[in-house]
Amino acid sequence: MAMGEFDLIKRYFQQQILVDDSVQLSIGDDCALVSVPENYQLAITTDTMVENTHFLPTISPEDLAYKAVATNLSDLAAMGAQPKWVSLALTLPNVDENWISTFSQSLLHTLKQYNVTLIGGDTTKGNLSITITAQGFVEKNKGICRHKAQIGDLIYVSSTLGDSAAGLTQILLGKSAVDSDDVFLQQRHLRPTPRIELGQALIGIAHVAIDLSDGLISDLGHILERSQCSAEVELTALPLSSSILNKYDRTQAEQFALSGGEDYELCFTIPPEYKDELELRLKKLNVPCTCIGKINEKCGDFSPRFLRDGKPVNITFSSGFDHFKESK
């Protein structure tokens, strides 16, 4: 007998791992009911992942579930929010119980890893896609937005850039992971780390923040447009991993870093006088952050300008991923 929607949910997704006092009503009713702490605001984000647009048909259900969760939590991290709850809308072409079992176990394990509770969702038949709505909370009026960059701010990025795009390139070419560099790059694509603790550490010192989902050029451009300013970025300051430099030349590595996307690192700005405070806060975290440029007065459009050793250079490759432009 074919498994129905409610049987599927009950068997695979109603295995609540966490006991969460903030959840008064969860899976099994028309809505979930949750409580937000006093003097905090609710932060909400939604992302959809569609097969052949956001992920390859060859991705494992374990990696797909992890990445679907992590990319949503990354949005909350950029706001400085504490992730708390998610709902899942899962569209499946058919009911493959082995696939669903593996996917659900990975999803619930990932949620437990980040202390997040699944509180509801929906399933339907169609081409494979995953939509997750993630919710969290941030102290009232303390959320880090995109529109408050100030002239003179220093621009920082976390960890290293371009690894995900380099890993995806290897996967698209059918390259097996034959050494530690390959493993590192491919895992950076399949298993990004949402910088939740970093986002919270930036509250009170960062003017703006964004997670790098579409590439540095594109995502920094969002900050510049919302903040009505321009920026200079020093290419020699871009943090590149030893793995990407072992596998690609510097020019290709920079291209991955600037326009590859899906690094899910944080890009943020702080006023220069908070530089020491930032370094102090970073000592408590295992996440290096690198200053790559500064915010300037608006000049021309909102695309960042690039320097190499302090001298202006032109960037000729793509600015980043855009769902609709890429489909034309």
Swiss-Prot record:
Keywords: ATP-binding, Kinase, Magnesium, Metal-binding, Nucleotide-binding, Thiamine biosynthesis, Transferase. Mg(2+) 4 binds at D30, T45, D75. Pfam families: AIRS, AIRS_C. Mg(2+) 2 binds at D47, D75. Mg(2+) 3 binds at D30, D75, D211. Its EC number is 2.7.4.16. The keyword Thylakoid does not apply. NCBIfam families: thiL. Reaction mechanism of ThiL seems to utilize a direct, inline transfer of the gamma-phosphate of ATP to TMP rather than a phosphorylated enzyme intermediate. Catalyzes the ATP-dependent phosphorylation of thiamine-monophosphate (TMP) to form thiamine-pyrophosphate (TPP), the active form of vitamin B1. This is Thiamine-monophosphate kinase. It comes from Haemophilus influenzae (strain ATCC 51907 / DSM 11121 / KW20 / Rd).
